[in-house]
Amino acid sequence: MKQIILNGNLLSDAATVHDYLMEMLEFPKYYGKNLDALYDCLTDLEPVEITIQLPEEDGAIFQKVLRVFKAADRTNEDLKLNII
């Protein structure tokens, strides 16, 4: 199973969050860079373990992204989510 570690500090910036996720999770070029597209891509992932490191500051953007990851984790049996 592929393992990916995401830096929560980079999930807190609205301007860069989707570019970071697209690169780290190897999303397709047509990724829509919004929360709905994030959910769609996360639910289509093949077996992967994603660890999200909590950010220094827990802002609104991070909370929205985290909710999407948790929802996708409940839907996609091939996605294992860890939060540290």
Describe the role of every protein-language-model region.
Residues 1-84:
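Positively charged, polar, low-complexity stretches
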